[in-house]
Amino acid sequence: MNRNVVQSENTFNEYNLNQDDNYDWYTSLGVIRARTCDEPPLIIKIDIALGYEKGDEQTKTEIDLRSIEIKDFLRKYFSKKSKSEITDKNEDFFMLEIKNFINDNILSNSKITEVKFLQKDIEN
């Protein structure tokens, strides 16, 4: 099967994450694959970093413990989006929605403060 990359957005890289002294970054979720709601569906691959207060080991531990729930949420979240929605202009909105959902519905003893995209690819 021929897979063509339709869109590739590397909107935030490891170098930039390391430059922000206010946060530690959880980058171990890995690449999450989902199918868009387009007909026919496209494949989206995303990798995100979750920022939390520097030195907050409780948040890091809780993210580790809840990583399966976070990945499942992200897969479902992007499965409800179309290619036309997954654009740079909507990225700030996505990051805010993702942060709020994780804080309100997945994490119970801690909070993340930032969400950044490390990778966002859409394929045929």
Predicted regions and their residues:
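Flexible, low-complexity charged segments
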Residues: 1-124
